[in-house]
Amino acid sequence: MTLKIGIVGAGGRMGRQLIQAVYHTEGVELGAAFERVGSSLVGTDAGELAGVGKLGIKVSDNLTQEKDNFDLLVDFTRPEGTLQHLAFCVEHHKNIVIGTTGFDDQSKQAIQQAAQNIAIVFASNYSVGVNLVFKLLKKAAKVMGDYCDIEIIEAHHRHKVDAPSGTALSMGEHIAKTLGRDLKTHGVFSREGITGERKPDEIGFSTIRAADVVGEHTVWFADIGERVEISHKASSRMTFANGAVRAAKWLSTKQEGLFDMTDVLDLNNL
């Protein structure tokens, strides 16, 4: 049975890539596409918007009107919008794939609570490569983390609105958890002026915003005399879109629960 996917933020950079990914993936089809109320894109053909040709699906600004046209929602928008879409999914018992970043703790709790009623994949990054890097970081932290300086450097395009990136924070959380540290206590997100010497248990973050960088992350495990770097560079948003569609197909068989790409890719068994 073909899975019908609804995509919110269809006119954005990721939204268009998601439509393309759905179009080129077997076993799924675009059921609905959404934009915010007042958008000039409402009423346009979603396929033409994404460059895959006419699909006969008009961009809508009303999830309720289209609720019978899709089985599952994919959301890469902003936290305030995603929480509204999440409430809709709970009300109408539709699963959701969330790629939005920048949530505060209260919003994350709302997602956890919603997962008692529907199935959710919530990940900071849907790239297969990045999620493999998460696994490698935990292994490196076990071997080197207690005696190395750990620094996370991330770069994204000038339009990204949150910093550090959700992926960088996830990297820090994986490392901190492996080392028995609390990232809220040990994470250092800004250095300026006379900061004093670096504390040995810090996990540092550096952020770059420039031009059209899709996404780059590098983690340093730096010791005196040597440094190990683990890096991932994305050259196209299609890697994230394809991963999100893969997650949607995997999620379609689930009833409730909160999952991430580790579950989708079965990385715990590596």
Swiss-Prot record:
GO cellular component, as recorded: cytosol
Localization (cell): Cytoplasm
Pathway: Amino-acid biosynthesis; L-lysine biosynthesis via DAP pathway; (S)-tetrahydrodipicolinate from L-aspartate: step 4/4
Entry keywords, A to Z: Amino-acid biosynthesis, Cytoplasm, Diaminopimelate biosynthesis, Lysine biosynthesis, NAD, NADP, Oxidoreductase
Protein name, UniProt field: 4-hydroxy-tetrahydrodipicolinate reductase
Gene: dapB
UniProt-annotated binding residues for NADP(+): 36
Xref: PROSITE patterns: DAPB
NCBIfam families, per the entry: dapB
Keyword Oxidoreductase among UniProt keywords: yes
Family: Belongs to the DapB family.
Location, primary (coarse class): cytoplasm
Superkingdom, natural source: Bacteria
Pfam families per record: DapB_C (PF05173), DapB_N (PF01113)
GO biological process: diaminopimelate biosynthetic process; lysine biosynthetic process via diaminopimelate
Active site: 156 (proton donor/acceptor), 160 (proton donor)
Residue numbers binding NAD(+): 9-14, 35, 99-101, 123-126
InterPro entries: DapB_C, DapB_N, DapB_N_CS, DHDPR_bac, NAD(P)-bd_dom_sf
CDD domains: DHDPR_N
Catalyzed reactions: (S)-2,3,4,5-tetrahydrodipicolinate + NAD(+) + H2O = (2S,4S)-4-hydroxy-2,3,4,5-tetrahydrodipicolinate + NADH + H(+); (S)-2,3,4,5-tetrahydrodipicolinate + NADP(+) + H2O = (2S,4S)-4-hydroxy-2,3,4,5-tetrahydrodipicolinate + NADPH + H(+)
GO molecular function: 4-hydroxy-tetrahydrodipicolinate reductase; NAD binding; NADP binding; oxidoreductase activity, acting on CH or CH2 groups, NAD or NADP as acceptor
